[in-house]
Amino acid sequence: MKKIKALLIGLVLSFSAPVFASDFDWSQCWCNYGAGIEKGDMLLSVDAALPWNFFDIINANGWAVPHVIADFEIAAPIWKLPFTFGGYAGVSFWGNKDFSHTAVLAGGSATYHVRMPPKNLDLYSGLKIGVKFDISNEYDNGIRFNPDWGYNIGASWFFSDSFGVNVEFGFPSSKAGVVFKF
């Protein structure tokens, strides 16, 4: 019964979208940024992120502080495709009674945006690649370098021309926070 209800709700929503967005040009959604983002705009997001192993650490009698990550991107389309390019940096802390870790990560990112109704919404998907410096008393030399890569799918909702909130799901972490547009 629950599956039938979910299917009916999905059908109603999918068929009602064109009614609520009758003035929306669906043929242009793949080649335009959402939420009024334009070529040359700069986006800065500050987020709290939960890595995939966050609860494994907690369940192993450990402690963890969610990652704090800042992303900076510039809107730079390729041909007609609405991409943003930039970088990210973050820090996190975790451990247990025997050891502690501090991870510092940094790298580059490329994100593809899609415009959908309503006009305040920006949908996107991206790739990130960089390096993670894992500093711990568990290692002989105190530090390890690891690749830091991932993918995500997310959405931003802008309350004004320059401020919004975002949520992102992906690997190796999912995150939520605020985004500023300059």
Predicted regions located by residue number:
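Outer-membrane beta-barrel transmembrane domain signature
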Residues: S22-L44, A49-F182
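Bacterial N-terminal signal peptides
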Residues: I9-S16
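Bacterial N-terminal signal peptides that target proteins for export
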Residues: M1-L8
